[in-house]
Each structure stands twice: as C-alpha cells, then as structure tokens.
C-alpha cells in the first residue's frame, strides 16, 4: 500500500508547520503507522528562506517540542511549490491566511486536497501564530489536538 503523503503548511515553516510535522511523525511512530504516511512541512512565504537556504526551526518552537521529547534537528524552511500538488495527497494549513495562500500557490484543482488543521477538531478555528504571541505552549497544545483529530479522521 502506498503511504498517504501529508504536507503541513504555515507562513514561514519555522514554527507551526514543523511542529505539526514532528508531532504527527511521533504519533504515527508510536502507533506503528510510520510506513502508512509520508509527512513534510513547508511555507507559503519565502521570508525564512535566503538564497535558497531555509532557516532552521525557530528556537522557542524547537524548545517546546523538546519539552515533549520530540526532536526536529536538521529541519530547515522550504517553500510550498505548485509542483507539490502532484507529490502530496493532503495539504494541512494552520490558519485562514495559510489556506488562501495555499490555494494561490497550488491552483484551483487543489481545493479538495487543502484543509485547515483545527477543522478536524470540534472547536475549529486557527492555530494562532506563536511568532507574535510567544505562546509556543498554546501552539503545541492546539497542534497536538489537531494532529490527533486528523489522524483519527484518516484512520476512520
């Protein structure tokens, strides 16, 4: 069976989407499902990518993951590209602005592949950007909840 390919997306790919990538990876590894999924993350913006080289995960995001025993070493920001549409089955954005930009980058035929993470949860809404709030603990909580709900939906 071919693994389901999931791309988590946020604005800069240094906080929320890499947190989602590595939280989801941990979840599937713990459940023995690592072979069932291929997981990555990317940015809608190039703000964290200079001369083709992406910045590493923002230190407070990396530290929040580490508090939960999750490592993200080696991860660097990459930008979502139109050709990713054929490489991934599902694109999961963190907020409404990400979703708008994902539609712009991926094009009209991507509509059924683009979802917002918190829409998988009963409360919906956006994952607030901790870059502005400095609340990486809240971002972790929301992303964890969203990833749990996403995995449950995919396994249903």
What residue spans do the PLM features occupy?
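Conserved active-site segments centered on acidic
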Residues: 1-87, 152-156
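A structural signal for well-ordered alpha-helical scaffolds and beta->alpha junctions
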Residues: 54-58, 95, 147
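Phosphate-binding/catalytic loops
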Residues: 84, 90, 96-156
